[in-house]
């Protein structure tokens, strides 16, 4: 749905027990305009999850989004910030320094930041033509399969699949920690 279809968004919120509204960066301004026109509509939303990336301009945009929503009456404790596409080898406070320089945003983040680290899993899946669910649910014993493979090509294919599975396992573990740190009720 487009942000302009705000009445339909409200209906869908009311039609379900739990709704996640993903407002892309290209729709955020229109979404905020509509939310302001439909006064009190922010009360239909339990949490506002704000993904923040490393680029300074986007960090400034995220601060502005939070500021605008707070001016509409959204309480500070209803915000959840996700530091997205973070690098594991650089401290979070350096990667997101613009965002964390804002006192309100820093307070929202708290002591246990929610972090989703950059990972090449989706590029690898795309290049190899593999589906996320297929790899995720593949519980074969790759070690045994590789040892019993009848050709070098089969061993390489199985070894590549195992490497993708291992990368996905690491990514999923990071997501589990991030979800836990969201502290959703």
Question: Which role fits each region the language model picked out?
Answer:
Residues 38-42, 54-88:
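Conserved C-terminal guanine-recognition region of P-loop GTPase G domains, centered on the G4
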Residues 52-55, 78-97, 114-132:
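G-domain G4 guanine-recognition motif of GTPases
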Residues 99-158:
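Beta-strand-loop-alpha "switch" segments that mediate conformational coupling across diverse proteins
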Residues 154-185:
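C-terminal accessory extensions appended to soluble enzyme cores
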């Amino acid at each position: 749905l487009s942000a302009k279809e705000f009445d339909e968004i409200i209906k869908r919120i009311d039609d379900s027990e739990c709704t996640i509204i993903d407002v892309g960066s290209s729709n955020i301004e229109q979404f905020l305009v509509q939310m302001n026109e439909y006064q009190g509509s922010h009360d239909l939303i339990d949490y506002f999850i704000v993904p923040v990336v490393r680029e300074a301009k986007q960090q400034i945009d995220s601060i502005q989004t939070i500021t605008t929503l707070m001016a509409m009456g959204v309480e500070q404790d209803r915000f959840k910030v996700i530091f997205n596409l973070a690098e594991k080898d650089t401290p979070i406070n350096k990667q997101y320094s613009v965002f964390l320089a804002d006192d309100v945003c820093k307070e929202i983040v708290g002591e246990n930041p929610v972090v989703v680290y950059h990972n090449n899993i989706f590029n690898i899946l795309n290049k190899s033509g593999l589906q996320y669910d297929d790899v995720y649910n593949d519980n074969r014993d790759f070690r045994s399969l590789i040892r019993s493979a009848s050709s070098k090509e089969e061993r390489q294919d199985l070894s590549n699949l195992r490497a993708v599975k291992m990368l996905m396992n690491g990514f999923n573990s990071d997501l589990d920690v991030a979800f836990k740190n969201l502290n959703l009720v």
